[in-house]
């Protein structure tokens, strides 16, 4: 039983240390990367080049999964 608790605790610690987020990546102004329907392959390439696990076009902007914390993401200040 102690082994199971230790294992679960380690998994939780790894999740805290290797944190990532799902978000709209942003350019230098804080604005989203625009895309159109059917450009999911372009968004996937952009997201993986930023260190994310994958991405797709959630029109009108790219949505990325697993972005590292160091990547800038959309924060509503751009109003676009």
UniProtKB/Swiss-Prot annotation:
Its main location: secreted. Residues 21-79 form the LCN-type CS-alpha/beta domain. GO terms for molecular function: sodium channel inhibitor activity; toxin activity. Keywords: Disulfide bond, Ion channel impairing toxin, Neurotoxin, Secreted, Signal, Toxin, Voltage-gated sodium channel impairing toxin. It is found in: Secreted. It comes from the Eukaryota. InterPro entries: LCN-type_CS_alpha_beta_dom (IPR044062), Scorpion_toxin-like (IPR003614), Scorpion_toxin-like_sf (IPR036574), Scorpion_toxinL (IPR018218), Scorpion_toxinL/defensin (IPR002061). The keyword Cell division does not apply. Disulfide bonds join 31-78, 35-57, 43-62, 47-64. Residues 1-20 form the signal peptide. SMART domains: Knot1. Expressed by the venom gland. Belongs to the long (4 C-C) scorpion toxin superfamily. Sodium channel inhibitor family. Beta subfamily. Has the structural arrangement of an alpha-helix connected to antiparallel beta-sheets by disulfide bonds (CS-alpha/beta). Inhibits the sodium (Nav) currents in an apparent irreversible manner. Produces small depolarization and induces repetitive firing in squid axons. Is specific for arthropods (crickets, triatomides, crabs and squids), but is non-toxic to mice. This is Toxin TdNa1. It comes from Tityus discrepans. The lineage of its organism: Eukaryota, Metazoa, Ecdysozoa, Arthropoda, Chelicerata.
């Amino acid at each position: 039983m102690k082994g199971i608790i230790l294992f679960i605790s380690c998994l939780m610690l790894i999740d805290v240390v290797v944190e990532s987020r799902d978000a709209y990546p942003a350019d230098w102004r804080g604005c989203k990367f625009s895309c159109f329907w059917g450009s999911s392959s372009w968004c996937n390439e952009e997201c993986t080049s930023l260190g994310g696990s994958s991405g797709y076009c959630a029109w009108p902007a790219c949505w990325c999964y697993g972005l590292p914390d160091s990547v800038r993401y959309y924060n509503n200040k751009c109003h676009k």
